[in-house]
């Protein structure tokens, strides 16, 4: 993904939407974090494709191409991670970071754990930290920083289970945003208390 495509996430949303569901989808951005080894990066990319197919903005940290960083002998990926976090924070969309921490395998690093620690320990990322959804295959392997998160972790048995549960959580986030948008615009409090019902539950 090039920088022009990424920049659209920071563009003010001014379109007219056909339904509250469409508007809700356009008001959030899923930010996928995790291990980027040869085993797990394809898992994140599969999830991103499925999320984008649902008309929801979705990024992985590797989307940002920065020549000054990528072309060096030892790329500073922590700097790239900071840049994309800042991009998300400056977006008009509500950021929803998903972190997938799989059981570490021989060929894997601890990228997802490092990202979690970075987000939790940097005060600048308080807004992101509040919205993090943590998916873990083994909670005992997660650094203690996860205790600072407001959301409980979601157990994932393996990659396929993570994909299924992450997509389910995307649906939940769409419902939450739709409810927020409805409350903002409706004066009838009784109407606001009604649960959001997607007009097309099968297709959401």
Task: Please identify what each model-predicted range represents.
Residues 1-204:
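Conserved catalytic or regulatory cores that recognize and/or transform ribose-phosphate-containing ligands
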